[in-house]
Amino acid sequence: KDVKEQYGEILTKIGSMGFSAMMHGYMPFDEEDNLLVPFRTWRNNITEQATDVLTPLFGQQIPQRWSIAHLYQAILNGEDHVKDLAFFTTLAGYIHWRMTGEKVLGVGDASGMFPIDPKTKQYDAVMMDKFEDLIADRHFAWHLADILPEIRLAGESAGSLTAEGAKLLDPSGELEAGIPIAPPEGDAGTGMAATNSVKQRTGNVSAGTSVFAMVVLDKELTKYYP
């Protein structure tokens, strides 16, 4: 609509597109794709109890904003919705899912849901096992690996715009389905790409709702620092 009004052109096709949004937070869904609780954003710092357990358990800093912290806090709170979990994701992951039908996430955004193994570029399997052991006595029907989004790397296929997604973007129906869509990413990874700060020993600073630095290390940290 904006293109049509400003330039007099009807937009029907785009070479490719992608979605970026705030990282972290918690959007849980059941088997029928119903949102189980209102979106808990990265600013909902309500997970101190969870992070006090997860950080030493994983041997890695787990900030309160991370999705796994929100999930475990909901478990500690005894929240009824947890038993009905079928999938949880970030805001970018949700929008991408609505546009493509694919429950995937770019590796950068995924790293704010659960720690990533830099060798496999997948969720850290050892830490996932530790989490499963931690909640084993709760006897949930789900396993963590089954409810997290699948990870996609830059350049990998992450789906294409469906007819339903095209209608959401353009209610006029002029935008065509089939447009390839990149893996959804978070604001931090988007800033890294925008500033060409993706090589080892480079970094960038982002300033907006919060101020943070993204630094690409040349090796893993040997320990976490409280």
Could you say what each language-model-derived stretch is?
Residues 2-226:
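Glycine-rich phosphate-binding/catalytic subdomain of phosphoryl-transfer
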